[in-house]
Amino acid sequence: MYGIAWMLPALILKCHGQTLIWPGYECVLQGLLALLIAQIEILANPLFIAASCLLLTPNKKIGAAFAITALIVATQTFTLFKVDIYLDEGGVNIAHLNSFGPGFYLWYSAIVLVAVAACVRLWRKSRSI
């Protein structure tokens, strides 16, 4: 799910009446620059990868913490509806988020799935003690 999300349209933007469609990989590249304007949702990716790896180890608490943190950070993506997205350095071309594409929903679902799996594993472990 996560890998496929990188190839599918993730963000659908409007700029001067034109529709721009950013696939997931472009969102990742642009997300690195978004850190400069306090848009931290790009950090959900390394947190997600760390959580996925930690769920395969006995560190269930740390894996759950990473997964929940990834989910919280990824949720900041919804604030993009209220943020100007600058497409050039001069501020001439400013886009606004129109809607999310299937890539976004797959990306977000993968993070939700890992967070739920981490919490279920942690809950099962606590009940077996």
Identify the function of each model-found stretch.
Residues 1-129:
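Compact integral membrane and secretory-pathway proteins
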